Design a protein with these regions (language model features):
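Acidic, proline/glycine-enriched N-terminal capping motif
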Residues: 1-197
């Protein structure tokens, strides 16, 4: 028999102590995400810069090497704004992130004729080439800051999953989409910065 340590007041407001505690995952994060969004579009890296001469001033400027980073960030911002509930306040606490990027498999990986939908056996199973996974994460994290999902991407303190796969893995690998894009989840980090905890 459980004996209460104090008597609850009859205020009509449920006690916060009566709530079921949130379950935590294996790495100290809450099992239900704070924020979740599915973004469609071609993921693009951010971070590689090229020197270009300004036609008007003649000065050298550093510009993003990938022209696709702007449209990708716009896709992330638009999807994140749609996914945010009304009255959303940007996250201000440390978060753990999961990002599963889906890339379109190049046409050269497929057969021809009646085998046009079949991946050639000689094609790579994984996208172990450009774009770099870390640069995909960088562009996506910055876009989430722009969408005010969190105050700053410096709040990302760990990754639960950071994955890139081809769209042909849809249904075989969790969160791989049927078309190019990304599944993003953010969790609060429980016990962050508690010494000895």
């Amino acid at each position: 028999m459980d004996v209460p340590l104090w008597e609850a007041e009859e205020t009509g407001v449920p006690s916060v102590f009566a709530e079921k505690p949130r379950e935590t995952g294996p790495v100290g994060t809450v099992s239900a995400p704070l924020f979740e969004v599915k973004v469609y579009g071609a993921p693009a890296p951010q971070g590689s810069k090229s020197a270009k001469r300004n036609r008007h001033t003649g000065r050298i400027q550093l510009v993003e090497s990938s022209r696709a980073v702007g449209p990708w960030r716009e896709h992330v911002v638009a999807a994140a704004l749609r996914a945010r509930p009304r009255g959303w306040k940007p996250i201000t606490e440390p978060v753990a992130v999961e990002m599963v990027f889906t890339l379109t498999r190049p046409r050269s990986h497929f057969g021809t004729g009646r085998n046009a939908a079949v991946v050639r056996p000689s094609s790579p199973a994984l996208p172990a080439s450009v774009p770099d996974l870390s640069k995909l994460a960088r562009s996506t994290e910055d876009a989430l800051t722009t969408a005010a999902v969190y105050r700053d991407d410096a709040l990302v303190v760990e990754y639960r999953r950071l994955v890139k796969r081809y769209h042909t893995d849809h249904g075989l690998v969790p969160d791989v989409m049927e078309a190019s894009g990304c599944v993003i989840r953010l969790w609060p980090v429980v016990g962050a910065g508690v010494p000895g905890g």
